[in-house]
Amino acid sequence: MKRRYSAALLAVILCVLIAAYNIIYHPVQSGVPVTSFPKVTHRILLVPLDSRPPCRTFVIDAARIAGCEIVTPPTEILDYYSQPGETEALQKWTMENIAGCDAAILSIDQLLHGGLLASREAKKTSEDADRLIAFLNSLHTAYPDIPLYAFNILPRILPPDSIDGRDEKKYLMEYSRLADRIDIATAPSEDELGELEWLRSVIPPESLTRYDLLFSENARLNKRLIELAAGGTLNRLVIGQDDGERYGIPNREKRELIRHIKTLKLDDENVFLTFGADEIALSLLAYIEAQRDGFSPGISIKYNSEATPWRIMPYMAATMETTAL
């Protein structure tokens, strides 16, 4: 019994000594309360590409680090996966909530189609596009001191999901690749021209028309947006290329837009063509914040091998070097 008592007493004494040692030699430092994020100093209105986290939540969180509050439309009027956003309500909300903001980042796909997925079906008419252009002009007229940063996405090479049939989609993809190769060829071969005609004959006419119309209507809209940038309605326009390949009709549209940009004598500060879609709003946020702070970051690229710059990665329409630069 005495041994148990002695052992317990010894354990208590050791605990007291250890506690005293820590208190004397390792005192707890008094903490200084800090805020989690900087104080909000400015606000940016955002109409996101769609409601997924990379397009909306990531932008909101990144902006808070810079002391910026992002104002976004209510989720009730935004897209929800395959359900398009309410475009008229979104335009109305934008007009009513832009006052007091220092800038606006606007997804054309959301304002016109109701999101990225809806834009791939392109159910909107030329008249709908005309009304959107009129809305952007009205927005700039009403708030001329608030810079508008808009972005639009080229249709991807993949046919819309509403076009059924594995063979039909396969032929459309082959048609798209071949049409682009012929467009850039100095002298296309008779075999290539013959194959293109054969593909046109085996693809159902309504599907071929819908596929071609995706790009022609998008090119028409992008040209008008480029002209808004030239005229000062848009402070900057970014055109992104989503899910591309080395050859495809999206590349042909891009070359057409580049010619239009050169005709208007615009530079990258007016209209910027890039690769990707989801990250464009974040990139525009970084651009706005860098401009605001007078910061110009320097970037150095180091490749893991000599062949890497010339590789074309899946879903990309250009080499790694072109994409990185």
Q: Across the structure, where does each feature detected by a protein language model lie?
A:
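Hydrophobic membrane-insertion alpha-helices, especially the h-region
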Residues: 8-22
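Positively charged n-region of N-terminal signal peptides that target proteins for export
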Residues: 1-5
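An N-terminal assembly and electron-transfer interface module characteristic of large anaerobic redox
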Residues: 22-325
